[in-house]
């Protein structure tokens, strides 16, 4: 009697999107909680920022669904920016205005303050990382429709992420390019996974499957990328360009998503719903947790895990309130 491993259903990427987003958000909070360099958990904690890559991959898949359903630019941009920008404006104002008044140094003039609130321009100009993921995502949205139309008409251009990977190398090692835009390494090194997500969108939409035997390849990919990333952070932290590790994050992201889907299939429904709830308010949680919750909790000098759990417990209700308030206000405006 032969035992066959069930095929891997790519549709689960869509089915468990909420849970995946929730897990990614928890990874990011784990990454932001401080930990001494000599701690044995330091390397694993440092790669929690792979949650950003998971966000971007899932965002790419979701954009493909949206575009193929209704390829209309006005509808596309309205849905995307009405979802992100109001929450961004509220939390950016809540951070940058008091910071400017109190001389915190993030905004040096009223013009600089306006730029930080509207488009977070100090990220683009000086690599100011307070809320970098949100302006980076909004920038990627600008280019997504053109890319999706391009690969629909000319599928060969699905290979463009390879060129994006080459660009990451150029921005690090070609001196004129590095001087011009090298400060945006954290953005450039995340661009490929976003467009890879778009590339995978059609396979997810068509509910394609992978041979069950491929699970062994996925596990090898996961372990190689995970363990090498942990080693780099635990042993070589600060001794290598970060884009190199983020190249490892690409296979780590894809393999993690596929393995997490198998986990979510087996978890009790209440736990899936709880993790999915975190995913549903992940935008707001990202904006709130670090600057408005975590930095105050860390003053209590608690150990790592109590700090993490207290941060989560405080952040989630605040994120839900922001999400509900913004959603209701936007619904009224758009009627």
Question: Which residues does each predicted region cover?
Answer:
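Amphipathic alpha-helical segments that form well-ordered structural scaffolds
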Residues: 142-146, 195-203, 259, 321-324
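Loop-centered beta-sheet repeat module
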Residues: 157-203
């Amino acid at each position: 009697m032969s035992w066959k491993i069930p095929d891997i259903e790519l549709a689960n990427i869509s089915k468990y999107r909420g849970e995946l987003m929730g897990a990614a958000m928890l990874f990011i909070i784990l990454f932001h909680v401080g930990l001494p360099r000599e701690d044995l958990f330091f390397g694993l904690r440092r790669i929690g920022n792979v949650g950003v890559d998971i966000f971007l991959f899932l965002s790419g898949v979701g954009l493909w669904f949206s575009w193929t359903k209704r390829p209309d630019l006005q509808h596309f941009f309205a849905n995307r920016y009405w979802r992100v920008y109001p929450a961004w404006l509220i939390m950016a104002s809540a951070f940058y205005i008091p910071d400017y008044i109190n001389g915190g140094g993030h905004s040096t003039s009223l013009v600089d303050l306006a730029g930080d609130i509207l488009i977070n321009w100090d990220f683009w100009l000086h690599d100011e990382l307070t809320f970098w993921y949100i302006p980076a995502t909004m920038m990627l949205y600008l280019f997504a429709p053109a890319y999706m139309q391009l690969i629909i008409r000319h599928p060969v251009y699905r290979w463009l992420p390879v060129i994006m990977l080459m660009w990451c190398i150029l921005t690090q090692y070609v001196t004129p390019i590095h001087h011009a835009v090298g400060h945006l390494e954290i953005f450039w090194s995340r661009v490929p996974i976003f467009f890879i997500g778009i590339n995978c969108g059609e396979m997810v939409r068509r509910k394609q499957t992978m041979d069950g035997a491929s699970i062994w390849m996925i596990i090898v990919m996961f372990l190689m990328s995970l363990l090498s990333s942990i080693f780099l952070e635990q042993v070589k932290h600060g001794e290598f360009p970060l884009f190199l590790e983020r190249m490892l994050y690409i296979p780590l992201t894809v393999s993690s998503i596929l393995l997490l889907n198998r986990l979510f299939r087996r978890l009790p429904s209440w736990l899936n719903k709880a993790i999915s709830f975190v995913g549903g308010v992940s935008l707001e949680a990202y904006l709130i947790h670090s600057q408005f919750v975590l930095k105050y909790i860390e003053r209590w000098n608690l150990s790592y895990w109590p700090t993490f759990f207290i941060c989560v417990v405080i952040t989630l209700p605040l994120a839900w309130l922001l999400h509900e308030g913004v959603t209701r206000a936007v619904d009224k405006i758009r009627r």
